[in-house]
UniProtKB/Swiss-Prot annotation:
Contains a DNA-binding N-terminal domain (NTD) and a C-terminal domain that facilitates oligomerization. Disruption phenotype: Deletion of the gene is lethal, except when the adjacent ydaS gene and the common intergenic region between racR and ydaS are also deleted, or when both ydaS and ydaT genes are also deleted. Down-regulation of the gene leads to up-regulation of the adjacent ydaS-ydaT operon. RacR silencing causes striking morphological changes in cells, significant growth arrest and cell death. RacR silencing does not affect biofilm formation. Encoded in the Rac prophage region. One of its GO terms (molecular function) is DNA-binding transcription repressor activity. Homooctamer. The lineage of its organism: Bacteria, Pseudomonadati, Pseudomonadota, Gammaproteobacteria, Enterobacterales. Transcriptional regulator that represses the expression of ydaS and ydaT under normal physiological conditions. It binds to its own upstream sequence and represses the adjacent and divergently coded ydaS-ydaT operon. RacR-mediated down-regulation of ydaS and ydaT may be critical for cell survival. RacR ensures that the prophage DNA is maintained in the genome. When the expression of the racR gene is reduced, the prophage Rac is excised from the genome, possibly to counteract the lethal toxicity of YdaT. This is DNA-binding transcriptional repressor RacR.
Length: 158
């Protein structure tokens, strides 16, 4: 992992690439995304220091324009939750993501961005398909929740 001035340069380069890609318009917009004031972004660049808790979001936010090697990493670290089941699930998801094609990764990045940035390949068909998927998954999850609740109902009283 880069640190100091090298990290500052890497942050500045990533911001410039993000602006050049058209997904953000300014450093101020980047600051808003990270819920910090614009001077903080300038400090990140100048001093190369950023709060460790912001690193995963930094990597995620710029993942459409730079990879882990840009930050001096071989791969992005996997979050380590306390629950071992969740950890195993995250490892599985990460392995699937790493094995996915560039096209699948681009789709995942777009979906996880919350439609904050819209690549050129996104058109009304893609938006309609995503809306339909979200609606179907919503119905599916509600049905699962309803089924789970009905199985947990126990008879009480006399």
């Amino acid at each position: 992992m880069l640190s100091g001035k090298d990290l500052g340069r890497a942050i500045e380069q990533a911001i410039n690439k993000k602006i050049a890609s058209g997904s953000v318009k300014s450093k101020a917009e980047v600051a808003r995304h990270f819920k910090v004031q614009p001077p903080s972004i300038y400090d990140w660049i100048k001093k190369g220091s950023i709060s460790k808790d912001k690193l995963p979001e930094l990597w995620r936010f710029f993942s459409d324009v730079v990879g882990p090697e840009h930050w001096g990493l071989n791969e992005y670290p996997i979050p380590t939750p306390t629950n071992s089941d969740t950890k195993s699930e995250l490892l599985d998801i990460n392995n699937l993501y790493q094995a996915a094609s560039d096209e699948i990764r681009a789709i995942v990045a777009f979906l996880l961005s919350g439609n904050a940035t819209e690549p050129d390949w996104v058109d009304h068909d893609v938006r309609a398909y995503i809306a339909a998927m979200e609606m179907k998954v919503g119905k599916y999850l509600k049905a699962l929740e309803s089924e789970r609740k009905s199985q947990n109902i126990t008879k009480t009283g006399t």
